[in-house]
Amino acid sequence: MDRLSQILWRERELLELLAYKLEVERLVLASGRTRWLVNATREIEVLLEDLRATEVLRATAADEAAEQLGLTPNPSLAALAEAAEEPWRGILLDHRDALVGVAREIAETSEDAKGLITAGYRSARETLLAIGGTSTASYSAAGAAVADAPRSHLLDRSL
């Protein structure tokens, strides 16, 4: 159980850091300074790799704890807590509550960032349509180049 608790602490730390990195990415998107977006995204990808490795360790430790408690493999954290005696019951429930809270925070921040990305895409598309014509398509379904009809432009020569 001690090993499982230590791994859960590590997972909580990584998830808190992920929440922070996602917030930074959201702020970069909101500011429009997309120059830093690649760096923010790279940091998140590295952190996600660490999280995946920690999840494997947690699953292994949870299976070991389940075996000690007479549970089937791949138990939920709530099931482990229910089967465990104090103080482990309280410790595991605290971990569960903290993990649920940070997961909720991550989901909300991700939705905000997704909204900003969608708005940015829409804005860029509208700008391209205003500059280049009625379509953003470059090629037809058959592979032929699509070109808009030439547009006449007004030019003020009095300047």
Where are these regions (language model features)?
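Short terminal interaction segments
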Residues: 76-159
